[in-house]
Amino acid sequence: MWRLLRSDAVAVLGDERAKKSLGRYFAVMQDQKIAKFMIARKLLAEFSEEDSTEELWQKHEDLTREFHEVQGEMDVDVEKFREIPVPEKSYLDLKIEMANRILRNCHFCSRRCSVNRLEGKLGYCRCGQEVKVSSIFEHMGEEPELVPSGTIFTMGCTMRCSHCQNWTISQWMENGVVYKPEKLAKEVEELRANGCRNANLVGGEPTPWLQQWLATFKHVNMNVPIVWNSNTYYSPETAQLLAGFADVYLLDFKYGPGECAEKISDAPNYWAVCVKNHLEANKLGELIIRV
């Protein structure tokens, strides 16, 4: 397909610093390596809905270690990925089960509202059980490494920034459109087929919708890197579930350790949460920081 690309979006592919910091992302983008979610879908997980949450977290921790080993092997030999059959239950399925449980006592973000979203209760972000989408399009205004970017803007946010550029989305000035995981997966595939370099999960804020995103990528059958485009105000549990799922963490670093975060964005303890999540993201994937 013919398209007009920004010159910096072309030049960045040859930039040595960009290749050093985002080398795996570029390889997935060019189908030379496999996106994390696709590897997670091939990794066998043995668990039951009868298992306690503590037991499931332990299994998830063990599988996360195994995932990194398997990813390392597949990065060297992509053919190994094709040889492995899809198991009845996978590492990705385990993540979906864990996220389902979090919905009953919601703590995807650091506010830990603890509402049961499966019963229709709403917390600070006002996100319910079914994901609502504002818009889906090929974005040409992101960082050069990302464009054209397959952006999916979901409703709601875990913060309330007075300077928010997407206020109508984050604060529910729009109704949004409900998407089932299978339908949203088709949108992701269409964006990729049309030349988008990635699936850019944004909003608002993607954090409240992590369960729905995990369920969506269970049905995506194209190799596409996932960009987790977040305000970084998410919980340790969300950070664990993002391991082996997000290829690139596109994270905000909005504030220092003073009172600005709470005054401007209603985000108490932002500095501590933000620092911890950036350090964790740097260990688990590749990182782009917005300041």
Segments (PLM) and residue ranges:
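Long, contiguous hydrophobic alpha-helical segments, chiefly transmembrane helices and signal peptides
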Residues: 108-109, 113, 150-154, 166, ...
